[in-house]
Amino acid sequence: MTETTAVVLAAGKGTRMKSELPKVLFPVLGRAMIHWVLDALQSAGIRQIIVVVGYRAELVRQELSGRGVDFAVQSEQLGTGHAVQMCKPLLEKGDNPVLVVAGDSPMIQASSVRELIEEFKAGSFDCLLGTLIKDNPFGLGR
């Protein structure tokens, strides 16, 4: 099995934010939130990262210039599954595992990413889903 590829979903508008700025570009501690996600993935040892862009793609591309990521374009926002499908041409090079994460999850930790990848590689899985157990899940999973 080859190295893990990460797909970062960053095509959405972030309608609830009531702004023209793509949600992944909102600042968190002085940086666009997507940088925290990319930092965690790269710290976990992931070398190939595909960022799916759509809404105001040029702003996201500009923000991420120099980060060494590849881009896939989701011209029409038709959901998460469709966004991942847009990566197919970049993923057909092998049978390596693919980790799909949201670009608006700045709290993701490299240790969690590493553990998920290790669990996947140790088992015989077609799919492995990382989840979170919360004492109070109110507001999650809209």
Q: Which stretches of residues belong to each language-model region?
A:
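Short clusters of hydrophobic/aromatic residues that line enzyme substrate/ligand-binding pockets
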Residues: 17, 25, 60, 64
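Conserved N-terminal catalytic core of the sugar/cofactor nucleotidyltransferase
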Residues: 2-5, 31-118, 122
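Short catalytic helix/loop segments, enriched in acidic residues and glycine
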Residues: 20-36
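Conserved donor-nucleotide/metal-binding helix-loop-beta segment in metal-dependent transferases, i.e.
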Residues: 111-139
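N-terminal nucleotide-binding beta1-loop-alpha1 segment
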Residues: 1-19
